[in-house]
């Protein structure tokens, strides 16, 4: 949406095309991987490389629960070579969660971790609007919990699900949190000047718990509004209810690398309005916090964040600075 609405173009002034400039798993109508457009076929060095949803949305565990990788999905050794080459030749890299699936080749894992400037913990989580709604709760969660704790799944209402390869934790709004703002995301103080247009908002999606390497800047943080009971459940997972959401690694002479520890770009806009001059302002104005609705996060946090990242890209309309 952003590339189209903001009129970003290649250096030859041609517009980006999400159908031809996308590489990775290609899905059929049922969401199954039907083929793959290999990154190795890329024949130019991009200004921006955005890496997300590398498993093709075929598995809502992100590989952490069943330790599997769908055939044709994930970052391959060849993909990593292209990514590294693009970065070394000036490309800005933006990556979202789920890159570090447990089935990843060890050399690729090491290179990705170094490139993004982060360390994984093996924990992912998700906001659940109603823990009794099994169209929203992942189907593997109740049996995993019941096997682990030996009791029936009897949770209800909004909550947070946390899972690793061998453990699951459920936090309920009614018992483990101070308010209905279970998980928020905000820009950190040192980056308010650059990203001040990003509002503090609730986050209602998948996220992961990662740790920044030394020298990696934490632009934004997640925060659980847990009470003492909730914090007790988080022992061994987090030392603090505040953890990294958006990070940036900068190396002198290289373009920055951004890592988002959440499913940030999970939103589909109304295509008919995309080219409308004031579309972004209208979307921000009509978006408000509705528990479980991701649109407010997209328009009041993610979109203004992304507008500040591709500064210097060719654009006939305007600069992002």
List each language-model region with its residue ranges.
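Extracellular/periplasmic catalytic domains that process cell-envelope and extracellular macromolecules
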Residues: 41-44, 86-88, 211-213, 251-252
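A glycine-rich, often tryptophan-bearing local segment used as a flexible ligand/cofactor-contacting loop or short
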Residues: 62-70, 74-195
């Amino acid at each position: 949406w952003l590339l189209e609405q903001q009129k970003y173009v290649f250096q030859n002034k041609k517009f980006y095309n999400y159908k031809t400039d996308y590489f990775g798993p290609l899905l059929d109508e049922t969401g199954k991987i039907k083929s793959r457009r290999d990154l190795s076929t890329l024949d130019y060095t991009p200004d921006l490389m955005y890496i997300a949803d590398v498993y093709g949305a075929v598995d809502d565990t992100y590989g952490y629960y069943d330790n599997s990788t769908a055939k044709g999905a994930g970052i391959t050794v060849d993909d990593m070579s292209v990514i590294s080459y693009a970065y070394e030749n000036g490309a800005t890299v933006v990556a979202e969660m789920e890159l570090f699936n447990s089935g990843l080749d060890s050399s690729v894992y090491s290179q990705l971790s170094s490139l993004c400037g982060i360390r994984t913990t093996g924990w992912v989580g998700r906001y659940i609007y109603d823990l009794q709604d099994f169209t929203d709760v992942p189907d593997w969660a109740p049996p995993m919990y019941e096997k682990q704790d030996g009791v029936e799944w009897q949770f209800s209402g909004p909550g947070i699900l946390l899972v690793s390869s061998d453990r699951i934790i459920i936090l309920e709004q009614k018992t483990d949190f101070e308010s209905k703002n279970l998980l928020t995301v905000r820009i950190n103080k040192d980056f308010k000047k650059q990203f001040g247009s990003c509002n503090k908002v609730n986050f209602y999606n998948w996220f992961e718990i990662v740790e920044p390497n030394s020298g990696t800047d934490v632009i934004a943080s997640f925060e659980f509004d847990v009470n003492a009971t909730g914090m007790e459940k988080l022992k061994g997972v987090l030392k603090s209810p505040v953890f990294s959401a958006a990070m940036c690694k900068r190396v002198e002479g290289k373009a920055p690398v951004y890592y988002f520890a959440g499913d940030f770009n999970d939103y589909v806009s109304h295509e008919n309005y995309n080219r409308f001059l004031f579309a972004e302002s209208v979307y921000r104005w009509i978006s408000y916090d509705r528990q479980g609705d991701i649109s407010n996060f997209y328009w009041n946090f993610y979109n203004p964040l992304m507008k500040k990242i591709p500064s210097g890209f060719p654009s006939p309309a305007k600069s992002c600075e």
